[in-house]
């Protein structure tokens, strides 16, 4: 992405603030004109004081400095007032839009597929969000407060200076050319270097976030020194990449200062010669020295702006790369909200592949009637989780169709579909909030009585009541203030509180002890009545009462039947059952464990 295209996208993100942006641009143009008038008036006053008549206001010749001074005061007051208004509005625009873009970015990444999040470190996404929106804020603020006015000053000053004295104006053009050449040279030399610097920043953020997320592991294995040393290594590489960039921009600063001094001396030298030949006045020499001083300030602001865009470019590229990531599924324009569904689920020749090469699910077909419990078993990677992910549209199949109550799920809004499906994940997912807030994820308006009932059914009420703050107890980051079994029971209670017609249990009882598991299974047996339930299971003892069992292998269903039917066939499921029962408790096949 070119620098011009990059900055165009920065301005496009102004969105609803674009109208105010245009108003600020017009105000900056007026400011540029007013600021140009001040050196002109200064020069004319010098001419008057030195005994030469000068052009006064409204085209009149003035022999008194007072009218010129009065006009200067008017322009000065206008510049101050307009500058204050522009600065205030630029500040407000930048802050408002930063928060709007940050919110939009957050909403966007929350809609990206789980495969994207699995391959992208959460610390990197946070770093891209914060650094990207901060970069946008700095560029918007600088552009509308200073940099655009500086550019407009160049547009106004250079052409008008030619109309006053083209010989002295040539020196100003020469100064601009030198600035442009130096800036272009350094940008080209350091562009790749700055990209490398930002890559090291990303590594630094990811490594620090990774270590902090596994602090228990670091302390347990006495890895503090090793992790600190690893971080220092990344910091050293970052500094090694950063120093050459800083050196090049330091050279630009020195060279521009030198060219500035040379230009002012040249204006005096050429001005003296022209004055001696009667081709310019003392006032015009002073005027062009003021022009040069103003031009230098504006050029430095423009270079600062270019430097800002250049320095922020890698961060903004990362930011736009995330924004350009496409969600796996979207609502169709004609998608409907079907309300509460009955739970009749149909898969018809459904196939899906993550990489377009190896199918994760292939030609999957089955029907689950309302109230039935369908168990999905098989080795890791066989396609069980992919099948249920397709059901709640984490992805859409490449071929085939999935229906609920006879409707293609792609014709339902995502919100409508997912309101009708409750999921209990194998790893309990909790927010760093209170137990009540975590439970209300399932039903935002749930009363305390409803939460107590759901917690009781999930065998979670006991430990909640024992806590000092009951339902206001803080769960901690990822629920770390609770045990694994407690986290999982809250996850089950949350799904029960949601009360969906379709329930997905992904090894929902795997984190529970035997006694609690038995109680939760009894509660789940009761709550699954009247719901279509999909159970992903590795422990076959947990699915003995399933209506039907689908045995997966390499994305296909190789066996299909009840628990006893599959045992009687003596196939793949029977071998799994024999291996598990013999290793778990030594009971014979077919005997409840």
UniProtKB/Swiss-Prot annotation:
Residues 345-579 form the ABC transporter domain. The keyword Membrane applies. Keywords: ATP-binding, Cell inner membrane, Cell membrane, Membrane, Nucleotide-binding, Sugar transport, Translocase, Transmembrane, Transmembrane helix, Transport. It comes from the Bacteria. SUPFAM superfamilies: ABC transporter transmembrane region, P-loop containing nucleoside triphosphate hydrolases. InterPro entries: AAA+_ATPase, ABC1_TM_dom, ABC1_TM_sf, ABC_transporter-like_ATP-bd, ABC_transporter-like_CS, NdvA, P-loop_NTPase, Type_1_exporter. Its main location: membrane. Pfam families: ABC_membrane, ABC_tran. Residues 21-311 form the ABC transmembrane type-1 domain. It is a multi-pass membrane protein. It catalyses: [(1->2)-beta-D-glucosyl](n)(in) + ATP + H2O = [(1->2)-beta-D-glucosyl](n)(out) + ADP + phosphate + H(+). Belongs to the ABC transporter superfamily. Beta-(1-->2)glucan exporter (TC 3.A.1.108.1) family. Homodimer. Involved in beta-(1-->2)glucan export. Transmembrane domains (TMD) form a pore in the inner membrane and the ATP-binding domain (NBD) is responsible for energy generation. This is Beta-(1-->2)glucan export ATP-binding/permease protein NdvA.
């Amino acid at each position: 992405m070119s620098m011009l295209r990059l900055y165009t996208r920065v301005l496009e993100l102004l969105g609803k603030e674009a109208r105010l942006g245009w108003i600020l641009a017009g105000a900056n143009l007026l400011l540029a004109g007013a600021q140009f008038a001040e050196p002109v008036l200064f020069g004319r006053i010098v001419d008057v004081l030195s005994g030469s008549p000068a052009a006064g206001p409204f085209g009149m010749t003035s022999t008194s400095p007072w009218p010129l001074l009065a006009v200067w005061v008017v322009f000065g007051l206008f510049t101050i007032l307009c500058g204050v208004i522009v600065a205030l509005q630029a500040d407000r625009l930048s802050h408002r839009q930063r928060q709007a873009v940050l919110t939009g970015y957050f909403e966007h990444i929350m809609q990206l597929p789980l495969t994207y999040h699995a391959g992208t470190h959460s610390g990197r996404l946070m770093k891209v969000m914060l650094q990207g929106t901060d970069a946008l804020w700095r560029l918007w603020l600088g552009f509308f407060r200073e940099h655009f006015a500086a550019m407009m000053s160049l547009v106004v000053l250079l052409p008008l200076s030619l109309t006053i004295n083209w010989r002295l104006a040539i020196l100003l053009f020469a100064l601009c050319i030198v600035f442009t050449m130096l800036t272009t040279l350094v940008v080209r030399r350091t562009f790749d270097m700055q990209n490398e610097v930002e890559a090291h920043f990303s590594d630094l953020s990811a490594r620090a976030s990774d270590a902090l997320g596994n602090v228990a592991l670091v302390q347990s294995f006495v890895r503090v020194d090793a992790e600190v040393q690893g971080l220092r290594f990344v910091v050293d590489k970052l500094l090694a990449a950063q120093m050459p960039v800083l050196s090049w921009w330091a050279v630009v600063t020195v060279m521009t200062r030198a060219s500035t001094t040379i230009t002012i001396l040249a204006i005096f030298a050429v001005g003296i010669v022209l004055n001696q030949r009667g081709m310019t006045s003392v006032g015009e020499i002073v005027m062009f020295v003021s022009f040069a001083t103003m031009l230098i300030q504006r050029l430095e602001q423009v270079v600062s702006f270019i430097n800002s865009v250049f320095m922020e470019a890698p961060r903004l590229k990362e930011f736009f790369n995330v924004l350009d990531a496409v969600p796996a599924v979207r609502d169709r324009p004609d998608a409907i909200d079907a309300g509460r569904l009955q739970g009749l689920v149909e898969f018809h020749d459904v196939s899906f592949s993550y990489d377009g090469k190896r199918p994760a699910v292939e030609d999957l077909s089955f029907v689950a009637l309302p109230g039935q419990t369908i168990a999905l078993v098989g080795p890791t990677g066989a396609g069980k989780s992919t099948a249920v992910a397709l059901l709640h549209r984490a992805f859409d199949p490449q071929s085939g169709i999935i229906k609920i109550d006879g409707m293609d799920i792609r014709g339902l809004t995502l919100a409508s579909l997912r309101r009708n499906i409750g999921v209990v994940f194998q790893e309990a997912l909790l927010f760093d909030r209170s137990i009540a807030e975590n439970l209300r994820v399932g039903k935002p308006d749930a009363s305390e009585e409803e939460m107590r009932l759901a917690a009781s059914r999930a065998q979670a009420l006991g430990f909640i009541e024992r806590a000092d703050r009951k339902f206001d107890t803080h769960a901690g980051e990822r629920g770390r203030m609770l045990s694994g079994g407690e986290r999982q029971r809250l996850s089950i209670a949350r799904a029960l509180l949601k009360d969906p017609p379709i329930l997905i249990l992904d090894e929902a009882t795997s984190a529970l002890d035997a006694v609690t598991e038995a109680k939760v299974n009894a509660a789940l047996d009761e709550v699954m009545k009247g719901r279509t339930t999909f159970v992903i299971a590795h422990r076959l003892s947990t699915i003995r009462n399933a209506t039907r069992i689908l045995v997966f292998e390499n994305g296909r269903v190789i066996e299909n039947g009840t628990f006893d039917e599959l045992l009687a066939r003596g196939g793949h499921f029977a071998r799994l059952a024999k291996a598990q029962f013999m290793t778990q408790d030594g009971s014979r096949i077919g005997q409840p464990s």
